[in-house]
Amino acid sequence: MRLDKLLVTRGFFSSRERAQDAIVQKTVSVDGTIVDKPSKETAEDAAIEVIDIFNKYVSRGGLKLEKAIVDFGLDFTGKTVLDVGSSTGGFTDCALKHGAAFVTAVDVGTGQLHPSLQGLPQVQSIENRDFRELTPEEVGGRRYDFIVSDVSFISLSYIIPYFAPFIKEDGQCVLLIKPQFEAGASFLNKSGIVTDEKGYKIAIQRVTQEAVIHRLYLNQINISTLFEKVKNVEFISLFSHTDTRYHLDYNVLFKTVKEVKKGLK
């Protein structure tokens, strides 16, 4: 039986989508071996163990930042972090659990930050505030080691121009690039999803070109965590003031996208 189906049959998950999420995240072992293919044929009496990663952070966003930390070899220990578009606080929670000393969480909404993060001495929550209107005085003139951002319904190209007063000269930016908010309406299907590689490329280029204008250079990029096969493809990216002459091979990147999508089928 397919592993994702078996996990539901044996009661590990309520749906195949959730089972697929867990498998792709490499949290399912079969007879002592981690399996990352939902379609893997598995004996019905196999010894299965599951690590519940979905309770690891206050939201799944934390898993996306965690992937950047692992893929890019980032060290948040003792660092200061500005979380732009913090929402529930997945990025904030992940940063703290990876050793960040202080996080300023900024969001245009109100009352979204998870209760477990509210009131923490190492978290400054600024609500009902468009980041583009944030002043250095509101954060005590602090410049941050990291700016992290997962925003929706707005292009990062409108956010990046406002990073300068808040980022240290040797700071880094971890940005989630969402093609559905970058590529333009012509690339969206009826479900509002970008599935075309040309759309992915345009989205990435829109962000990187705006970043260069503000002396922020792409250092690394990879596909972000995919949770369900119906969801948008997103890219986690790393920028800094250091031009590493990073060569983005779109063929390699999009090959990875295809492989991950195939694994979810």
Q: How would you label these PLM feature ranges?
A:
Residues F76-S87:
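Conserved class I S-adenosyl-L-methionine
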Residues M1-A46, T80-V81:
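A basic, amphipathic helix-loop patch mediating RNA/tRNA/ribosome contacts
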Residues T104-L156:
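S-adenosyl-L-methionine
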Residues V233, S240-K265:
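Flexible, glycine-/basic-rich loop-and-beta segments that form/coincide
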Residues S157-C173:
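A short glycine-rich, Lys/Arg-flanked "PGG" loop and its adjoining helix->strand segment in the class I
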Residues V28, A101-V106:
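Short beta-strand element of Class I
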